[in-house]
Amino acid sequence: REVKKNYAVPRKTEIRDEIVDIKLDAKEMIPDEKCVIVVTNDGYVKRVSQKSFSSSTEETTLKPGDYVTNKFMASTRDSLLLFTNLGNYLYVPIHILPEVKYKDLGKHISNTIMIKEQERIVASLILKDKSKTLTLFTKKGLTKQVLLKDFEVTRYSKPMMAIKLKDDDELINADTSSDEVLFVTNNGLYLRFNTNEIP
């Protein structure tokens, strides 16, 4: 009682009947680290720290006949979209990609998300401005526009359909930057139109 009398202090916490739910954004738990993403024609994808990229004096390692199709500045909180010739897309949170040195070969995307043997990457982009529209192009001249936000998913362990294709068709590109589209046929004819004419 003597101790309580001499050292008692008012309670600093409040006791309440109800429990307040605390919702955490999983994305906020991921360290925000700047990095470089390298994508190759054969489907190799790697994440490189900005330091490794800036200090490297060697070219990135590639398999014979392979070449780099895209190189992005990104954050570990971003996601990478990869589109395949079979009309599918892969949603790849960048933080799940192992960090390697710029000169290293990296891993084939099938080590992260399983794709078919005949499936190959035809386009790639970093998912940032989800209000943008993506235009998909097929070998047979089919076009389709989709809002980037529609590609965001919570489960990404397998490829998902971006566009439904006929058996003899395949996806050849996906692009967000074009205001106009120019199609050229194998017999030398071409068709030019504005992307706002695409449904």
Question: PLM features: residue spans?
Answer:
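Short, structured "edge-of-domain" segments at secondary-structure transitions
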Residues: 1-199
